[in-house]
Amino acid sequence: MVLVGICFLAGLCYFLFPYFNSWMVNNDAKKEIESFEVLKEEKNFDTHDLLFEMMEDYNNKLYKDGQNGISDAWTFDQKDFVIGDYDFKNDVFATISIPKMNLEMPVYLGASKENMAKGITVLANTSLPIGGKNTNSVLAGHRGYRGVPFFRDIENLQVGDEITVNNYWQEIKYIVSDIQIILPSESEKILIQEGKDMITLITCHPYRRNYQRYVVYCVREDEYKKDGNSVVHQGSKVVKSSKNDIMIERYLPFILLLILIIF
């Protein structure tokens, strides 16, 4: 009986860990967002204006230089623009809100392992998310990590859905314009598109595997309307949806726990 009890407790801990970790990460994310909002309200205009100018210069140079060195997010490249140099307390630069995914998360500069374990990240050698012509900020997130959803439900997004990026200067609305599946090596598929103001969401695909990338292209709201809902890319690959795998993972532990309790 003692052994059975120990096995039951071990199984229960294993079952509960993802939910506990998800609660912890989401709670920390909520605090980071609240801290971000406070800093935004209390911003030093001289420092913030200088930072904005430096970021614009960075984005312009990135476009002119052709984004040399861009690579897959899961190589965990470190950040190449440090906002701590401008008297900021942390690397939270913005927040992202995706109603269709019931997601609100802080956005960190640099797709490091640490940053990707606690939020959404800006891929190195892509535009900083401040908007503007000739920009494409590639925002990377795990397809679920240790119980935290992150971009797990990205397949819920459809063309026409709204995504909001809130940085220190403005709130920018983007509209999903196209969805593609690409290979990790196809970095040319996430480059800046001439004349466009974009963000691109990227995560692993299929779910629980990482040999492909699920990519959601989004253009700024006014551009989406002006262009007559035209897409930036044309997807060509037919792929299997991960929704069934996600559903099984979500409910199977409860079924197994119920069976364990009954028997």
Which residues are covered by each model-predicted region?
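Solvent-exposed, non-transmembrane regions of membrane-associated and secreted proteins
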Residues: 1-251
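Selective detector of the "anchor" transmembrane alpha-helix that sits immediately C-terminal
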Residues: 249-263
